[in-house]
Regions:
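Extended, highly charged accessory segments
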Residues: 1-174
Length: 174
């Protein structure tokens, strides 16, 4: 069991009839949801942590993180887990441990990826993910490898700026 705190800082404005993106708007006060739910986790291999931390770029002025390949891995694993659990985007969450982006940590410090139910008390999705973890990892590899894009896109790794071969290095290393 885990305690999850979800925050919403902004929202996307869209037209109803064609779903055209009209921009984003910052909320005056963040919306939050705090709940206990079920989860499972997997440890990221040490060699993957070393590579991914070595590629992180931080803009000191804005504190904006670039090249977060953990996000690409989480995106692929979440999509693969959704297929196995027959869930929607809003039913499960996938996130890395807080130390994943901390460059001050030793590159050999453990980084974990957590899968959790987005419902109070959980609905058993995390347990099903645990039971099918090997299949989920293999499906994530197939999703990323099988994409027709050249480098990476919103369909396979979630962000076109991420190199899909580097993202693929994560799940292949399990």
């Amino acid at each position: 069991d885990v305690n999850v705190s979800d925050y919403v800082y902004m929202f996307k404005k869209m037209q109803f009839h064609n779903h055209q993106n009209l921009g984003y708007e910052q909320l005056p006060k963040a919306l939050s949801k705090d709940y206990d739910t079920e989860s499972t986790w997997m440890r990221v291999p040490e060699n993957v942590v070393k590579v991914y931390r070595g590629l992180i770029q931080v803009n000191e002025n804005t504190k904006m993180v670039r090249n977060n390949y953990y996000e690409g891995v989480c995106f692929a694993l979440k999509n693969a887990a959704r297929m196995v659990t027959m869930t929607e985007q809003e039913d499960i969450g996938v996130i890395t441990s807080a130390n994943a982006l901390e460059l001050a940590f030793d590159t050999s410090s453990d980084v974990d990826i957590y899968f959790y139910d987005k419902y109070v008390g959980g609905l058993g999705f995390a347990e099903k993910i645990y039971d099918n973890m090997e299949d989920i990892i293999q499906n994530a590899v197939k999703l990323v490898k099988g994409c027709g894009c050249k480098d990476g896109c919103a369909a396979c790794v979630g962000d076109y700026r991420l190199d899909r071969q580097v993202v693929l290095f994560g799940p292949v290393s399990y």
